[in-house]
Regions:
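Conserved alpha/beta core of the MobA/IspD/sugar-nucleotide pyrophosphorylase nucleotidyltransferase superfamily
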Residues: 1-42
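Nucleotidyltransferase catalytic core that binds NTPs
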Residues: 36-188
């Protein structure tokens, strides 16, 4: 499965996940044991959070990759949480939640009220949290450190995907900032 993470052009389905499924099936009892192990792997809860209101293919790629890891819970930052560190969202939180609910592979959508993941981790106890690797430094680093500490208390894992630096995503962001800055779009 590591090759799937390196290249989106492959689709290899693993029969063993970190030795959690390895075993011989010689009789019905073995099959029952292996089936139970498979269900445990599939039942893992995976959490990923978004503040975006402009969904692009990079976001969909993260969702697709995260969904491979288990039941995908998508957190949508509240309007207030988003506005606390960047502009007020163009699309209200309830609409953004509806948008994510309609995406294949999303198991549940919840609202995240703060930049901290603490309340989410305590409430949902995810086995895996997925995030872009862009929070290793800067203002998000303390939140990352908190996530690592909270997950380590019960054996949860943080999976960080490389943050996309594709120019087309930067263009979408720049275009939306430009449109928002035009006098016709400003209100007093």
């Amino acid at each position: 499965n590591a090759l799937n993470e390196v290249s989106d052009n492959t689709h290899i389905i693993p029969y063993d996940v970190k030795d959690e499924l390895c075993g011989e099936v010689d009789n019905p009892e073995d099959l029952a044991v292996m089936s139970e192990r498979l269900e445990q792997v599939k039942a893992k809860k995976v959490y990923v959070c978004f503040s975006t209101d402009i969904l692009h293919s990079g976001h969909l790629n993260i969702l697709r990759r995260a969904a491979r890891l288990g039941h995908l819970i998508v957190g949508v930052m509240s309007d207030e949480a988003v506005a606390s560190y960047k502009r007020f969202p163009l699309v209200p939180c309830e609409e953004r939640k509806a948008m994510f609910k309609s995406i294949k592979g999303v198991w549940q959508v919840v609202e995240q009220d703060t930049l901290s993941y603490k309340d989410i981790i305590e409430k949902y106890h995810p086995d895996v949290i997925v995030h872009g690797d862009n929070w290793k430094e800067g203002f998000q680093k303390p939140f990352r450190d908190e996530v690592i500490e909270l997950l380590s208390a019960y054996g949860g894992k943080l999976v960080e995907f490389p943050y996309s630096s594709d120019p087309k995503y930067k263009e979408v962001d720049a275009r939306s900032r430009l449109e928002l800055s035009l006098p016709d779009n400003r209100t007093t």
